Amino acid sequence: MTIATASARARPSSLQYAKDLLLLAKPRLSGLVIVTSAGGLALAPGHVAPARAALTVLATAAVVGAANALNCWMEREIDARMRRTRDRPLPAGRVDPFTALGLGIMVPVFALPVLALVANPLTAALAFVALVTYVAVYTPMKQRSTLALLVGAVPGAIPPLMGWTAATGRLDAGGLALFALLFAWQLPHFLAVSIYLRDDYARGGLRVFSIVHGERTTRAWIAATAAALVPVSLLLVPLRVAGPSYGAVAAVLGVALAGYAFAGVGREGGRWARNFFLATILYLTLLFVALFLGAR
């Protein structure tokens, strides 16, 4: 079924349509942005008024949601070929492509000035960099090169840095360490996704790591990047973003995740990759809990 055919379906209810508009923003990804940007605000030195902090986080989430909507618009034909994504609002014909495009363009027009006013111009500039990198570089690059993994990790790691700069007004070692942590975490996380969704990505014509380099090589890179995550997560201690209790928890969690990654190097099939993907989510959740509880 083509997208044009799907668009001819009956108009959904107002509630369903509102839900579909929200789905364009990819709520799970936007939710992670809310948590990490709020985390950057909370961990940064100094005090930020609650109203200002809330507006900063909401404006950040709005920019990221708009980037996701533009990604959905650009990849609607690809999504229609993939089982995991073919029921998304655009390939299923429940939302008109021009609506998604309009939201993706107009929301940042309002959200970026809000960030500049309630936070500072530096934070708004970081949001703009994340938007452009995700939409104009990462999204088209997914069909051409496995380097899209590294490029896509940049906008994914910027939200906690935005939270930090919103509180401090500057780029410094503490904020960059938070950026490095989220950047490093995404590598084994999405490499695992490329294994257990390999067939679906192949249907979509996306050049993910497991398709180009093979599953065994991908598993080896999962182990290597999971191991690299351990020292990166510990950088927050000498930089005095977090205390020794966080360091102890981060070391245990990191070694456990890396051990699980190395145990999967010689395995076959997608089950382990799916379990490792879930393990990375648990790891990040527990790490942020420890980070908040062990902050200096």
Curated annotation (Swiss-Prot):
Xref: PROSITE patterns: UBIA
Coiled-coil regions listed: none
Pathway: Porphyrin-containing compound metabolism; heme O biosynthesis; heme O from protoheme: step 1/1
GO annotation terms (biological process): heme O biosynthetic process
Membrane-spanning intervals of the chain: 29-49, 54-74, 98-118, 121-141, 147-167, 175-195, 221-241, 246-266, 275-295
Reactions performed catalytically: heme b + (2E,6E)-farnesyl diphosphate + H2O = Fe(II)-heme o + diphosphate
GO cellular component term of the entry, any: plasma membrane
EC number, as in UniProt: 2.5.1.141
Record's bilayer topology term: Multi-pass membrane protein
UniProt keyword annotations, A-Z: Cell inner membrane, Cell membrane, Heme biosynthesis, Membrane, Transferase, Transmembrane, Transmembrane helix
Intrachain disulfide bonds: none
Subcellular locations according to the entry: Cell inner membrane
GO terms, molecular function: protoheme IX farnesyltransferase activity
Assigned protein family: Belongs to the UbiA prenyltransferase family. Protoheme IX farnesyltransferase subfamily.
Note: Carbon 2 of the heme B porphyrin ring is defined according to the Fischer nomenclature.
Protein function: Converts heme B (protoheme IX) to heme O by substitution of the vinyl group on carbon 2 of heme B porphyrin ring with a hydroxyethyl farnesyl side group.
Protein name: Protoheme IX farnesyltransferase
Species for this entry: Anaeromyxobacter sp. (strain Fw109-5)
